[in-house]
Amino acid sequence: RGKGSEFFGVVVVNWLLTVITLGLYYPWAKERTLKYLYANTYLENDRFQFSGTGKEMFVGFIKVFGMFLFLYLAFLFAAQSQNTALSAIILLLFYAFILGIIPFAIHGFYKYRMSRTSWRGIRFGYRGDRSTLVKMYFRDLFLTILTFGIYSSWMTIHLRNYTLSNVKFGSASFKHQANGDDYFFLNLKGIILTYITLGIYSFWFQRDIINFYFDHLSLHHNDKKVKFKSHLSAGDIFELLIINLIIIVFTLGLGYAFAEVRTLTTMFSKLQIYGDIDLDAIQQTEAEYKNAFGDEALDVMDLSGVI
């Protein structure tokens, strides 16, 4: 139920303070953004709440920034020494660090973001095991490299199935049960038809991906469940992307806030939740978690798509 004009005020203040503070305000800007978006997202006329703080995210931001700064300075030193071999080693270590930190960042993201998300006073939570996720990630990464990217569809589904199936909403549990084969052929069809139609099919392709993710998600409690069903159409995607592009281009980027609100409004308005769970019977079971390292790591690396 957010309004572009209201969110625009949040975004402009965030931009100004982030620039003035040379980026240091960014975690607090992120806090204000998430709190606005959560507070304007409703289920059965009750809003969601984000209780994370800029201070928590700033600590995570500093940790991530420090790691990247160390690697950058090491590479800069190697480059200035004109030692080609050392520069190559540092560069390889940098890329290895990026690939290696992803599963830890995903785990940390879910632990923090879920514990800071609530509805009707009931917190979400994440019960996944870090070592299990790390082993799964590196196994699938190896197979993806070995198959020149073909296995990436199975890797994506394995990660989504594991992480989302370990998300809790109080005493209720989420399940994401998708098949890598189905996802592979969905992507294969989408890529081929998008290429043949010179990009026109991309709207149907994006619709299929989004609907696939939602349609395999469910929430379970006391032998009862609710399922998620997305009714997003290719026309919805086309209208959303074209109008958002026009808004952003003709406002020189200032219309980002309006585009973001339009996107979330469209996505949630097309999402149906149906089933027989008694939401009032769900009880608080999840503890707080204040380490925002994973949340900031995914943000800094712009890898939110992996979740």
Which residue stretches match the model-derived regions?
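Transmembrane-helix bundle segments that line or gate the permeation/cavity pathway
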Residues: 2-7, 11-84, 88-122, 126, ...
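Loop-to-transmembrane boundary segments
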Residues: 4, 53-66, 129-146, 180-192, ...
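Short loop/beta submotifs within extracellular cysteine-rich repeat domains
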Residues: 7-8, 56-57, 132-133, 154, ...
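Hydrophobic, aromatic-rich membrane-embedded alpha-helical segments
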Residues: 11-31, 137-158, 191-207, 242-262
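Juxtamembrane/interface segments at transmembrane-helix termini
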Residues: 30-36, 104-116, 152-165, 201-218, ...
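Juxtamembrane inter-helical linkers in multi-pass membrane proteins
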Residues: 37-51, 113-133, 162-183, 211-232, ...
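Membrane-proximal intracellular helices of multi-pass ion channels
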Residues: 57-60, 237-240, 244, 249, ...
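Membrane-helix interface segments in multi-pass membrane proteins
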Residues: 70-98, 210, 214-215, 230, ...
